[in-house]
Amino acid sequence: MTNQTAIVSVEQLTNSSVLNLIERAEAFKQGATCELTRPVYAMNLFFENSTRTKTSFEMAERKLGLSVMSFEAETSSVSKGETLSDTLKTVQAIGVDFVAVRHPQNYYYDDLLADPAFHLALANGGDGSGQHPSQCLLDMMTIHEEFGHFDGLKVVICGDLRHSRVAKSNMQLLKRLGAQLYFAGPEEWFTAEFNDYGQHVALDSILDQVDVVMLLRIQHERFDSAETMTDEAFHVKYGLTAQRAAQLKASTIWLHPAPVNRDVEIADELVEAPQSRIFKQMHNGVFMRMAMIEYLLKQKNLIKD
């Protein structure tokens, strides 16, 4: 890893560090523990709505024995015009050690990490349409548990490619780990940045070949009104319907970062079907975030060897 006290992008992670984090997350899932060198304080600063990521970080922090400080953006001084930098300097000054941050600005963390006075351990909980490293890593853990490897796996990422930070993080890491990528969904959402990672295909043309179907939420809140497509039209043309699921191999799994728009990206009856790993992803997320936090705290000598 390039920055030892922050995990903000999968681009900074080496393949070996990813596999080490997966191994440690799987150990936590089996009951492994760690010991703090002193009381450690955490805060989760989310400037966009979140259920899974925020509560998953909090559960991970509590399982590791951290004291979790509350923060709500709408009742903080951010509502009075305070900058993110000043908010985090305040958090640092009162004695917080670790922060998970979600912010609508892409690369919000660049200026923070360039500031020599900033020494909080930081996990990026999502930046705009940029990166979502913890979601990507829990996805990698879920795939690894299923197949034991990544090399040669065929993965199709389907849905709102243009606005998805999950797509960007996952395509970067999956390609490096040896998977073969395809993209499906409206062709106008497939932009030039995806060309280096895989080809755009019609979903129906590859269903019988893929090992993993990675579905993406349609992010209505990021669309201009002119871009919208009805939910029904999307489901018929690009969604994982029962008819499409029947064409998949018995060993194929499907993932979704959630929240799920049922009967849009995926048919309602498939969300909890035997080949779905959607709720397993959420379960694994706690253990992967434990592994990430432990790694960062070790760099600050806050975890005993």
UniProtKB/Swiss-Prot annotation:
Biological role: Catalyzes the condensation of carbamoyl phosphate and aspartate to form carbamoyl aspartate and inorganic phosphate, the committed step in the de novo pyrimidine nucleotide biosynthesis pathway.
Source superkingdom: Bacteria
Binding site for carbamoyl phosphate: 52-53, 102, 132, 135, 258-259
Assigned protein family: Belongs to the aspartate/ornithine carbamoyltransferase superfamily. ATCase family.
Protein name (Swiss-Prot/TrEMBL): Aspartate carbamoyltransferase catalytic subunit
GO MF: amino acid binding; aspartate carbamoyltransferase activity
EC number, as in UniProt: 2.1.3.2
Gene Ontology biological process: 'de novo' pyrimidine nucleobase biosynthetic process; 'de novo' UMP biosynthetic process; amino acid metabolic process
UniProtKB keywords: Pyrimidine biosynthesis, Transferase
Stored InterPro entries: Asp/Orn_carbamoyltranf_P-bd, Asp/Orn_carbamoylTrfase, Asp/Orn_carbamoylTrfase_sf, Asp_carbamoyltransf, Asp_carbamoyltransf_Asp/Orn-bd
Record has Transferase as a keyword: yes
Name of the top EC class for this enzyme: transferase
Residues engaged in binding L-aspartate: 80, 165, 217
Catalytically driven reaction(s): carbamoyl phosphate + L-aspartate = N-carbamoyl-L-aspartate + phosphate + H(+)
Gene (name only): pyrB
Cellular-component GO terms for this entry: cytosol
Subunit structure, interactors included: Heterododecamer (2C3:3R2) of six catalytic PyrB chains organized as two trimers (C3), and six regulatory PyrI chains organized as three dimers (R2).
Involved pathway(s): Pyrimidine metabolism; UMP biosynthesis via de novo pathway; (S)-dihydroorotate from bicarbonate: step 2/3
Organism per entry: Latilactobacillus sakei subsp. sakei (strain 23K)
